[in-house]
Each structure stands twice: as C-alpha cells, then as structure tokens.
Amino acid sequence: MAVAQELYSFPASKLDSFVAQWLQPTREWKEEVLETVQTVEQFLRQENFRGERGPAQDVRVLKVLKVGCFGNGTVLRSTTDVELVVFLSCFHSFQEEAKHHQAVLRLIQKRMSYCRDLLDLGLSNLSVIEEVPSSLIFTIQTRETWEPITVTIVPAFRALGPSCPNSAEVYVNLIKANGYPGNFSPSFSELQRSFVKHRPTKLKSLLRLVKHWYQQYVRDKCPRANLPPLYALELLTVYAWEAGTQEDSNFRLDEGLATVMELLQDHELLCIYWTKYYTLQHPVIERFVRRQLKGERPIILDPADPTHNVAQGYRWDIVAQRASQCLKQDCCYDDRDAPVPSWTVKRAPDIQVTVQQWGHPDLILWVNPYEPIKKLKEKIRLSRGYSGLQRLSFQEPGGQRQLIRSQCSLAYYGIFCDTQICLLDTISPEIQVFVKNPDGGSHAYAIHPLDFVLSLKQQIEDRQGLQSQEQQLEFQGRVLEDWFDFKSYGIQDSITIILSRKREGKAPSAPS
C-alpha cells in the first residue's frame, strides 16, 4: 500500500491532514460494512438456538454488541474486520460460560451454515478459533462492492445488566471465578467500548494514527512475532493523552505520536491501570489488584477487567525497536528539523501515600512509584521538620511489615497504588522493631538496644490500649522477660516481635 510508506515521510505539522486524507473512513464505506453486518446481527437475534449437548434450555440472544474499532469509533479506512459480542440467556455465571462456551460456539456455527441470508452474502471460512476466549470467525461480502469482511463472534455472560452497571459484587465474582486472564473480558465489553467511544474526536485521530503505524510498520513487518494486541496500544495512547494533556481536546498529533513512541521504548517500566469501573475500597478487589501490579512489567490492566493485563507475554522489544525508528522519521521532526517535543508522561501514575506516625496527624503526599525513597523522606522532612533518622515501613494485607530502604523506590517493592506508610523518627543509637498484633497487623516502635523489654510494652499500652501486664512478647519462639534488655536477646534493627495476650502455661525465658 502506498500509505504505508507515506507516514514516515509526512511532515509532522501536517499529520492532521494525513489522518483526514488517508485514515478517516468514508461514510459510504462504513455504512456498507455495517449494513452487511446487520444481516449477521438479525440472524443472531431471531434464531432460537438449541442443541443435543451443552445448555439444557433454549439459548436466546439478549444483546449483540459491536466492539473493537467499529464499536468505539476508531475504525481505519478500508478496515474489514468486525467483532461482535453476543450476550446469551444460557449463561448465568462466569462458571457456566466457561463450561458451555465451546458447545454454544459449535451450535451457532451449525445454525449459521444453513442461514440463507448469510449464504447469499458468500458465507465462507466458517470456523471456531481456539484463542482467549474462543470465537467463531467467518467471511461474508458486502452487497454493493462484494468486498470480503471478516466477522468474529464471541459468546459472553452478561455480567453487567442495567441494574448493576459496575457493582463491586460482579468484580468479586470475576476474581473468584479464577479464569484464564482475558477469558471473561467480553462480559465487560460494554465498558471497554465506552472507555474509548466517548473520548474527544482529536484523541480518536491520535488512536487512528498509532494503530495505522502499528499495523503498517510493526505487524506487517513481523507477521509471525507474538506481538501485543491493538487494544494494548489503544490503552497506552489513552493514558499518554490523559497524563500528558490533562485530557485537553486541543493538542498536536505529532507530539502525541512522539509521546507514545517514547513510552513504547520504556515498555519495561510501564505500570498503568484505571479504577473508573471498579473500586479498590473492596478488600477482595484491592488485594487482587495489588497482586496484579506486582507482576512483571509492562502492566496495562484492562480498565473494565482488572484480571487481564493486556500487555503480558508479548514481544514488546520488537515494538520498542520500531518505535525508535519512528522517532527518527519526518513525522516526528518539526519544520526546523528538530525532534518534535513529547509530553511529560510518567511511566506509572503518581499515587497517594499516607504517612502515619504515632502522635501526629496523617501526612498525605503524592509520590511517583519510581522516585527514590530518599526524595519521599525529603518531602516528609520539609513538611514536618524532623532532624532524626526517618524509618519508613509498610505492610500489605496478609503480609509482613517491611522496612523501606532509602536507595530503593516504591516500585522496587511493587507498590503502584495508594498506600499507607508508617514513619518512625529515631535518634542513634535507637533501632526500629516491628510488633505484630494478633490480628496480623503490625506497628513500628523505636527502642534503645539497652532498654528493658518493659519499656516497649509501655509504648504498646500507650498506642494500642493493651495493658503491659497483659502483654506477651515473643522473639524466635522465646517469651521476653520484662527486666532484660533487647541486646541480651540478640534483637537487631527491623526484626519482628510477636505480640499476644498473656496466657497461662508459657513462662518468660531469660537470655542464654
């Protein structure tokens, strides 16, 4: 195609014209394609599917949804691939869908092969594709020009009905279903479509430009490589626009293109997610998302399906190489032959860090996960004026409290979403110890190695209300005696001491 060679030689200042002239589809083409696909939709809505195997009841179509580029308004000129998600009455849960998915696909395939209206459109290549999730794919032809169109059908459980557009319970059920990542994403296709569909027209132009580049200069050049899906590039582009322009609809396409290319070069740092459709206030969802964000990067979580990292397992190194080449072309250089400036976009969004310290109000800071911890400590020092040694620690639900080291970053500890950090201000030779409570939580305390154990119990009583005579402290299986010092037990910096309510039968042990 001539267009494939033209983008790299097109002036950066004229990319708007490039999109309008070469990438924007004509109204006539879109109408011809959609009119043809409407025949498929009518077949699905009118047919009452029932087979000898699989679901025991009749299978009715609840809704047919156009997804992908035809659904979200970012279709490229002459695109001939249409995706349909079909919500079915026989699926009442994610588990039922997983159980009957293949049987339903075979049933639709069988009925479709006898449909006269589709046969009149040259129905061919009808087959089930074993992907994630499995789908039915076939080719038909437009009525006017007889152009071949590839249609993909994916059956899905309608998890989000009109009464619960984004219920936390739905996402808890999704997590508990424990499906293969992406297997149940079609259930959330309405949200996926809305995430892009209602964006400004200028952003859709940038999306078309990025997708055109990806198809012509990456996919076509490396047809056998395991490359990321277009959806991952779309989400990355949306993130670049949100973070780089503060969602301004008036921006330069060349700057947007250069920004996306630079992000692709830094793919190993990307950790991107949204909480537009679900909340981290629910403990099950919070624990799951935090675990997701600790995975190998790049991480781009589907905004509608947090179980699916759409960037996982692909050859991003190839995409990065192609992005580097793109940045050297005319489309990324201005009229003075200088590189087009890119937007300031962090490789992971800033997060809210709540700094907690006993006896002080919480301190709220916005921090980037890739910033060195020493920068965070400097922000705390400027806010609170501490002169002692700052000891920071954190504890995730169900985990152990960990010391945060100055030379590391929050990203090093896998922290990419809002978190709480404990601050302890110590003065040498004081050390920090973690005291783990019976409920699994823990607190940090400052102690002098030569202080008695009783001094720590008094701190615990002041903070937590449990009287010192009712406390039992253990370290390495030994109950600590009130009138011995910490050094005699070999207690060193940042170790964990177990707190429990004193019970009969286990006597304190003196140091050996």
UniProtKB/Swiss-Prot annotation:
SUPFAM superfamilies: Nucleotidyltransferase, PAP/OAS1 substrate-binding domain, Ubiquitin-like. It comes from the Eukaryota. GO terms for cellular component: cytoplasm; cytosol; membrane; nucleolus; nucleoplasm. CDD domains: NT_2-5OAS_ClassI-CCAase, Ubl1_OASL. Disulfide bonds: none annotated. GO terms for molecular function: DNA binding; double-stranded RNA binding; nucleotidyltransferase activity. Keywords: Antiviral defense, Cytoplasm, Immunity, Innate immunity, Nucleus, Repeat, RNA-binding. It is found in: Nucleus, Nucleolus; Cytoplasm. Coiled coil: none annotated. Transmembrane segments: none annotated. Its main location: nucleus. Specifically interacts with the ligand binding domain of the thyroid receptor (TR). TRIP14 does not require the presence of thyroid hormone for its interaction. Binds MBD1. This is 2'-5'-oligoadenylate synthase-like protein 1. It comes from Rattus norvegicus.
